């Protein structure tokens, strides 16, 4: 298992820039060519002048998380690099920068990336352009949102992008079990968009919410396979511990 960052180039904020700092990195994924990925410089970035994120229930603290490269996302990208390309429809939920989707897209898979952040689509378009790829399908994917904004006012507006349409043979998501979901909104969202015969991939960095999600998925007819991920630090790449969760329904 090999992935990491190569030849990072910082893109400095200029007067004409959109109001946040970004960086560009060459991401190495074993078995496929490196990907150029533009991401936020760090988790201190914030720019929501029209309250688009605020109106979707995204707080200033969570605003930058979509635009960072996360270890779980790199593990998912590595998994996608090894999957044979077929005629299946693939949906990535909570895609953030969409690294796994970009790997699949470049290999010729039929993949749709989705996220709830108002800038995720723009970053995905920029990263497809940086890698000389044709446009990738994108949709707004939100499986639950708070009733109130960070400032206490009601969440009012809807997203600019359409919701996922049709059913998918493979649905994947990395680090999506980050909060309690007693009502099972994530499992219900997956169920609504999964084909009758489908596979679900979740990379989870041991967030602690797996047990409830397992139960919710089982109630929807999904069988589970769990693989322990325990990779020591290697050549500048941080150690990683988590689970690769595979749910199948046939």
Which residues does each PLM region occupy?
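S-adenosylmethionine-dependent methyltransferases
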Residues: 3-250
